[in-house]
Amino acid sequence: MQIYPLRLLPNKIDFDFMNFKKVSYSFSIILSLISFIWIGIYKFNFGIDFAGGIVIEVRLDQAPDLPKMRGVLGELGIGEVVLQNFGSERDLSIRFGSSSEENLMKNIELIKASLQSNFPYKFEYRKVDFVGPQVGRQLIEAGAMAMLFSFLAIMVYIWVRFEWYFGLGILIALVHDVILALGFMSMTKLDFNLSTIAAVLTIIGYSVNDSVVIYDRIRENLRKYHKKNITEIINLSINETLSRTILTVITTLLANLALILFGGEAIRSFSVLVFFGIIAGTYSSIFISAPILTMFANRKFNKKVIER
């Protein structure tokens, strides 16, 4: 039985990506500067994880309808409200952002009254705690360290598998993707919480995977076409992997779209940011990480790159 691969593009496609190198560099620099300026002016919409807040622990007489409950509490106008089960399905944790002292008790009573009037459950309020912003600062530091270590691990991996200048190309693309993702988060006022840190790490992984696929094809074509220059090799490699890249990004975006539409508020920031990051990562793997290799066109590519 013969298997026919799924293709969205013809087998022989010869689009000159490298002809847009300067345009793509300029475009990326402008977007990065806009992101920096926007973040500097408007900052981030820090969620409860980082800004601190109130935690109310409740036990109900039956399993609650969490999506409906999130919708009701989200309409109170007191900011982000996070509901989660802990322990059994009847135990509920309600978290919302810290307020001024005079509004603190008012918001707690507002939540209690809203739950009592909209749901037929019996509520047993077990504990009310205040989580200070100091914990948030520790989480921000931990998230920053996680991203730093991921950058370093990726650099070492690419250096071992290819050569240091390949790692430089990926590092520049990753910094570009993270800056755009943070700028997008600031512009859209997505909650900056632990799930968005996970989203940024997911974007990093996706972008690296895309770039490594192209780099592998570049290395393979360096073995096959000794007379072609590096610009021709990169163009050929991007075109040969383009169908795979488009198929992968479409299927991933469709899966992520389902999370955005049906995942609820609990993972909205994560899914929206990953959706944007997949697009940014695909763009950077084609127009940034691969074209950067032309900076080394005047030096002979290390034989280790071709032989590995």
From Swiss-Prot:
Disulfide bonds: none annotated. It is found in: Cell inner membrane. GO terms for biological process: intracellular protein transmembrane transport; protein targeting; protein transport by the Sec complex. Its main location: membrane. GO terms for cellular component: plasma membrane. Gene3D superfamilies: Multidrug efflux transporter AcrB transmembrane domain. Keywords: Cell inner membrane, Cell membrane, Membrane, Protein transport, Translocation, Transmembrane, Transmembrane helix, Transport. It is a multi-pass membrane protein. Part of the Sec protein translocase complex. Interacts with the SecYEG preprotein conducting channel. SecDF uses the proton motive force (PMF) to complete protein translocation after the ATP-dependent function of SecA. Belongs to the SecD/SecF family. SecF subfamily. This is Protein translocase subunit SecF. It comes from Rickettsia felis (strain ATCC VR-1525 / URRWXCal2). The lineage of its organism: Bacteria, Pseudomonadati, Pseudomonadota, Alphaproteobacteria, Rickettsiales. The gene is secF.
